[in-house]
A protein has these predicted regions:
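Electrostatic interaction modules used in gene-expression and signaling proteins
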Residues: 1-458
Length: 458
């Protein structure tokens, strides 16, 4: 292992002692606290003063104190005014994990809770002999079905074939570029958020690495290795210089065909000069507290048999979020166009938008009423189905005005469970005339899970 990473790992292991439970000497399993004791132990000074003065615990204050207490112990508050300590933790579980669980009814927290489970499990089951794991974001996004296995393949497919498919599907290249750019950014954001949550509670340490592909003359074989500090400095400087000189963003280097081609040619001379064939970014994850990692799975009621359900849920929630993001961007563009129009009344008339709604700020008011009503019904249906049985395999899709965005989502994000019980893309690339001979890891779902609509009965 590289000495600079080994030194950091040893430093992080030393810091684990700081993540201890300060309440272990105050409470124990089986303790039954009344409201006053509950507030005095876990409340802030201000919360304690307010309770002492009023002898009342308002709901917002109770929730705030409970969220803090749940970082250190499991509590049963099924009986009003009684707080039974079910278990005292050795380490703090962290406020963000408690938030994911406590506010599970919101889609964002539910998504983060499920992602936390599968990321934690994946790290624990894939670590190497050094207690570490190379974590490539897109690889794991595919494994967790945030995206389907069309995603990376279609991004880098031959441009002539891509154009044929885009024309066949009625998708513009700019829409595809914007969607890929947005999704890539979201993949990075949501996965790094979970890694940061685990790092904050001293369960893991994360290092961003630059990996390179080289060829060794002695055996004429290719190897993926971590770049040295000198190699990383040369490659990073070349990228920064190119972006500054050509006034382009980082994402443009990989999504816009003409820019990417020029960038690749520019980088080739730099890479050749240091004997490198290609490069990519990855994250090195090291476990520094495996006890806490395992406890997170227990605390969040993780069950390995539920992994297929988690994957289906993640795909639904992530794809739905991406469609909403795309729609919001379209709304903002239209609002800007309306505001910049010299003749607002004429613009609204030509676009069949009600002039009376101009004074309202919410874009939804500009959408024809039948679309609004349809969307409300869809959202109500989704909420009812989720609250009743959380059957993610049967949730209806939120209505999105932009059909082009829906087609892109179906192609590179959405998955379905086929008749063989496997999670596969909604639109397989081989159905579009693409050689799909490459073997991909598929996720099998047991017959029992399918029969129960994705819900496993205990």
């Amino acid at each position: 292992m590289d000495k600079r990473y080994l030194d950091k790992l040893n430093q992080e292991k030393f810091r684990v002692e700081k993540n201890t439970n300060p309440y272990k000497k105050i409470i124990k399993e089986g303790d039954e606290l009344d409201t006053e004791k509950f507030v005095n132990i876990f409340g802030s000074p201000q919360q304690k003063r307010n309770y002492k003065k009023t002898k009342k615990l308002v709901q917002n204050t109770k929730e705030s104190i409970m969220k803090k207490a749940l970082q250190y112990c499991k509590i049963d508050n099924s009986t009003s005014g009684k707080y039974i300590i079910k278990e005292v933790l050795n380490y703090s579980i962290g406020s963000k994990i408690v938030k994911f669980i406590y506010n599970e009814k919101t889609e964002n927290n539910l998504f983060n809770l499920i992602l936390l489970k599968v990321v934690t499990y994946s790290i624990l089951t894939n670590i190497n002999e050094n207690n570490g794991l190379s974590f490539r974001l897109k690889k794991y996004a595919e494994q967790f079905t945030l995206i389907n296995y069309n995603y990376q393949k279609f991004k880098y497919i031959d441009e002539n074939i891509k154009q044929i498919i885009l024309e066949d599907q009625g998708i513009s290249e700019i829409s595809l570029h914007n969607f890929y750019s947005s999704v890539d950014e979201s993949i990075n954001g949501c996965l790094l958020n979970i890694l940061n949550v685990l790092e904050e509670i001293k369960a893991i340490t994360v290092t961003k690495n630059l990996m390179i592909l080289i060829k060794k003359d002695e055996d004429n074989k290719y190897y993926k290795v971590r770049a040295t500090e000198e190699e990383e400095g040369i490659i990073t400087k070349a990228i920064d210089d190119y972006m500054a000189h050509n006034k382009v963003n980082y994402s443009d280097l990989f999504y816009k065909t003409k820019i990417k081609d020029k960038f690749d040619r520019y980088m080739k001379s730099t890479l050749d000069s240091i004997g490198v064939i290609s490069w990519y970014r990855t994250y090195e994850v090291f476990i520094i507290n495996s006890t806490l990692m395992n406890y997170i799975l227990d605390y969040t009621d993780f069950d390995e048999r539920d992994l297929p359900i988690y994957y289906i849920a993640l795909n639904y929630l992530f794809a739905d979020k991406m469609l909403k993001n795309a729609k919001n961007k379209k709304e903002k563009r239209l609002l800007q166009k309306i505001k910049s129009s010299g003749n607002v009344e004429q613009y609204l008339k030509e676009n069949h938008i009600d002039i009376e709604n101009l004074t309202r700020n919410n874009f939804r008011d500009f959408i024809p009423s039948e679309y609004v009503e349809r969307e409300k019904k869809e959202m109500l249906k989704i909420t009812e189905e989720k609250n009743s049985k959380k059957d993610f395999t049967k949730l209806s899709q939120t209505y999105i005005e932009d059909e082009e965005t829906e087609k892109i989502s179906d192609l590179i994000l959405r998955v379905e469970v086929n008749e063989r019980g496997r999670i596969e893309p909604l639109i397989p690339l081989f159905n579009l005339g693409i050689d799909n001979s490459k073997e991909y890891e598929r996720i099998d779902i047991s017959e029992e899970l399918l029969l129960n609509g994705g819900n496993r009965n205990e």
